[in-house]
Amino acid sequence: MKTQVAIIGAGPSGLLLGQLLHKAGIDNVILERQTPDYVLGRIRAGVLEQGMVDLLREAGVDRRMARDGLVHEGVEIAFAGQRRRIDLKRLSGGKTVTVYGQTEVTRDLMEAREACGATTVYQAAEVRLHDLQGERPYVTFERDGERLRLDCDYIAGCDGFHGISRQSIPAERLKVFERVYPFGWLGLLADTPPVSHELIYANHPRGFALCSQRSATRSRYYVQVPLSEKVEDWSDERFWTELKARLPSEVAEKLVTGPSLEKSIAPLRSFVVEPMQHGRLFLAGDAAHIVPPTGAKGLNLAASDVSTLYRLLLKAYREGRGELLERYSAICLRRIWKAERFSWWMTSVLHRFPDTDAFSQRIQQTELEYYLGSEAGLATIAENYVGLPYEEIE
């Protein structure tokens, strides 16, 4: 097999890169370890920045998103008996976010790829990357017991935190930055109307809570829990009771409860690896960085990586400026670290940490009061929440 760009991973970042390249006439093949149903079964993020919405539109996969996505012009933070709304649209110069689940984004991209006939190999086992620093890298993998080889010009590693792509870079070439948080999020998905038309983030003495949504009829709620907690110890009734206890009373009274479609506990981590490239291998998305979900940045950072890599590949193929690809990591990391900072900050001011003393607790409350009581503070939150601009590539 032969292609121009080999893409490892058929999650949203790999599929989005593949679709953009296909529309630009650049041949690509995607290799995915799992089945399509497994990929679609992942319950993930649902808040899309303006930049990602624009990128999906550019890729020609925005029809269902335009119809079913919920445009949010604001977000609310509740703390210390107060509720403060942040007017995202006014404070960011007209930008908004769109609530549209990652599962739906993935489905749209899968259908678009199938319709255009581009190659995706699912259940590709024993994937290995070779000659990454040479002129002609290649990928080997197994499919139905047969060992196959895929020759290419470049490899995009879009296979997530546990994927083979980052593992294919010599450890001594990488610098890892990481913070693991001492709690997780217990999330519940239910076919109940959302308690609010905008997201509500709550800082409460019992711990953080988030009221989110996937559609006008499907809600997603989260509560902060210790890492020692097990999902099976949380009945639906226990979850709803705990959620209500952490929300402002007027919100809790309106909460519509119902049977859970899914419950899971996600640990929280900040993680960045530098550099994000090695020879002709380029890491994108969770393969290179993880953010705690508090800032809704994970999927959106993957999209900005994809945008950067796509535009650099266009320069390489259309203008013969392959040397620009050497700037990929530096361009991406400038935006990534700003999103890491915002996600860390949101996590720090909204959660209860097990070692927090009275002084730290008062500082946390004052931090929220300052940012939410100041036009400059509100604007800072808003511009980060809707997404910082993508860097132009000359």
From Swiss-Prot:
Reaction catalysed by this enzyme = 4-hydroxybenzoate + NADPH + O2 + H(+) = 3,4-dihydroxybenzoate + NADP(+) + H2O
EC numbers for this chain: 1.14.13.2
- Remaining remarks: Controlled catalysis is achieved by movement of the flavin and protein between three conformations: in, out and open. The open conformation is important for substrate binding and product release, the in conformation for reaction with oxygen and hydroxylation, and the out conformation for the reduction of FAD by NADPH.
Stated family:
Belongs to the aromatic-ring hydroxylase family.
User: This chain belongs to which protein, by name?
Assistant: p-hydroxybenzoate hydroxylase
Instruction: Please give the subunit comment from the record.
Output: Homodimer.
Keyword Nucleus listed = no
Pfam families, alphabetically? FAD_binding_3 (PF01494)
Keywords recorded for this protein, A-Z? Aromatic hydrocarbons catabolism, FAD, Flavoprotein, Monooxygenase, NADP, Oxidoreductase
Q: Which organism is it from?
A: Pseudomonas aeruginosa (strain ATCC 15692 / DSM 22644 / CIP 104116 / JCM 14847 / LMG 12228 / 1C / PRS 101 / PAO1)
Cofactors required: FAD
Tell me the classification of the organism that encodes this protein.
Bacteria, Pseudomonadati, Pseudomonadota, Gammaproteobacteria, Pseudomonadales
Q: Which residues form the signal peptide?
A: none
Q: Which top class of enzyme applies to this chain?
A: oxidoreductase
Q: In which pathway does it act?
A: Aromatic compound metabolism; benzoate degradation via hydroxylation; 3,4-dihydroxybenzoate from benzoate: step 2/2
Positions marked as site (Important for catalytic activity): Y201, Y385
Q: Its Gene Ontology molecular function terms? A: 4-hydroxybenzoate 3-monooxygenase (NADPH) activity; 4-hydroxybenzoate 3-monooxygenase activity; FAD binding; flavin adenine dinucleotide binding; oxidoreductase activity
Q: Name one GO biological process term.
A: benzoate catabolic process via hydroxylation
Function noted in UniProt: Catalyzes the incorporation of an atom of dioxygen into p-hydroxybenzoate (p-OHB) to form 3,4-dihydroxybenzoate (3,4DOHB). The reaction occurs in two parts: reduction of the flavin adenine dinucleotide (FAD) in the enzyme by reduced nicotinamide adenine dinucleotide phosphate (NADPH) in response to binding p-hydroxybenzoate to the enzyme and oxidation of reduced FAD with oxygen to form a hydroperoxide, which then oxygenates p-hydroxybenzoate.
Residues where FAD binds: S13, E32, R42, I43, R44, A45, G46, V47, Q102, D286, L299, N300
Residues reported to bind substrate? Y201, S212, Q213, R214, Y222, P293
The record's free-text note on cofactor binding: Binds 1 FAD per subunit.
